[in-house]
Design a protein with these regions (language model features):
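The canonical Cys-X-X-Cys-His
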Residues: 70-73, 161, 216, 222-231, ...
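Structural microenvironment flanking redox-active thiols in thiol-disulfide oxidoreductases
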Residues: 76-138, 253
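A short beta-strand-turn-helix
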Residues: 39-59, 208
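Short active-site neighborhood of thiol/selenol oxidoreductases, capturing the structured segment around
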Residues: 50-74, 80
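Electrostatic cytochrome c docking/interface patches
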Residues: 193-221, 234-241
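Axial heme c-ligation environment in periplasmic c-type cytochrome domains
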Residues: 238-247, 264-296
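Short, internal strand/loop/helix patches
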Residues: 114-158, 267-286
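Gly/Gly-Pro-rich "capping" loops immediately C-terminal to redox-active cysteine motifs
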Residues: 229-263
Length: 326
């Protein structure tokens, strides 16, 4: 009888362990069987496995970049930095950012570390490199590489961002150029099953009256505010990625500004003195070519020339989202 009892107890323990494992891994349809356990190396030289170390049971944001990119990657990194600042100390504890290089031969850990420092990246955000073929497979599994696209063609890399909660199986593809508050809300609230307690209870009666922003203001908020401010104080400018644009239409010639907005990459290649000075002043982060047309250029300059623009609230100026209640 004692032997039977011991055997039954052992079976129950084994069953409980199996159920625990199933609960940990089986609640999500996207688990170890789907995600490759790609070996990667971060900017500090730490070797990590994609599934085991980086995403298992975590809320994450994942994008693919390369440091030699002069078009969209700098703006993408700057926008995600805004999101990181909004989330505050929760990044690295409750959620994690990963930027994976698609040019691992050039993007060594040392290069990635220097790149992260240029953008004043905080804790909880890893920049990763590894084997090209393995990273290519990872891009495909995450839906960020069309099988018809040559993975060697870096100019065709996806600009989308993958955010998700591996434990619940919630995954979505979003634009990194989305409003930073919306991205922060998705990462900090909706993907976390709204576990953050609201610090205040606001009344709709106290809500400010909404106004329709001008086309120029919309352009500034969506294309420029990740790197530029309007009327920032000296303390904020010490961490700035680009110059403050308050009064820029009075400081620069109109023709220079128009061309700079249309083709900053070409002006840098031509070593325009002002463009080169700005490039050196701001950690060699080149302004990306945003593909603005003439109508957009004029709308943006019109907004920047408006004195009221200097008082426009800056994206990213709000305090971090509240910490989760304990």
């Amino acid at each position: 009888m004692r032997t039977l009892t011991l055997q039954l107890g052992a079976w129950l323990l084994a069953f409980a362990a199996a159920c625990s494992t199933a609960a940990a891994e089986g609640d999500s349809p996207w688990g170890r069987d789907y995600f490759p356990n790609t070996e990667l190396v971060d900017q500090d030289g730490q070797h990590l496995r994609f599934y085991d170390d980086l995403i298992a049971g975590k809320v994450v944001a994942i994008n693919f970049i390369f440091t030699g990119c002069s078009a969209t990657c700098p703006a993408e990194t700057a926008r995600l930095r805004q999101v990181q600042k909004l989330l505050g100390e929760r990044v690295g504890k409750e959620l994690f950012f990963y930027s994976i290089s698609i040019d691992p031969a050039a993007d060594t850990p040392e290069v990635l570390k220097a790149y992260a420092e240029r953008f004043h990246v905080g804790p909880g955000w890893r920049f990763l490199t590894g084997d090209f073929a393995a990273i290519t497979e990872l891009r495909q599994r995450l839906g960020l590489l069309d099988i018809r696209v040559d993975p060697q063609n870096k100019s065709e890399h996806s600009l989308s961002l993958i955010i998700g909660n591996q434990a619940t199986g919630q995954w979505m593809k979003v634009s990194p150029f989305e409003n930073p508050y919306i991205l922060a809300d998705r990462l900090g609230n909706s993907l976390q099953n709204w576990k953050v307690a609201s610090a205040t209870h606001n009344s709709y009666a106290d809500a400010p009256q909404l106004r329709t922003p001008s086309p120029g203001e919309q352009l500034f908020r969506t294309r420029c505010s990740a790197c530029h401010s309007l009327g920032a104080d000296a303390n904020a400018m010490r961490q700035a990625i680009g110059p403050d644009l308050a009064g820029v239409t009075r400081r620069r010639e109109r023709a220079w500004l128009e061309r700079w907005l249309r083709e900053p990459d070409r002006m840098l290649a031509e070593q325009d003195p002002t463009a080169t000075a700005l490039y050196r002043q701001f950690n060699q982060i080149g302004m990306p070519n945003l593909g603005l047309g003439e109508v957009e250029v004029q709308a943006l300059l019109g907004y920047l020339a408006d004195p009221s623009a200097d008082a426009t609230p800056r994206a990213g100026s709000a305090p971090p989202l509240q910490q989760a209640s304990q």
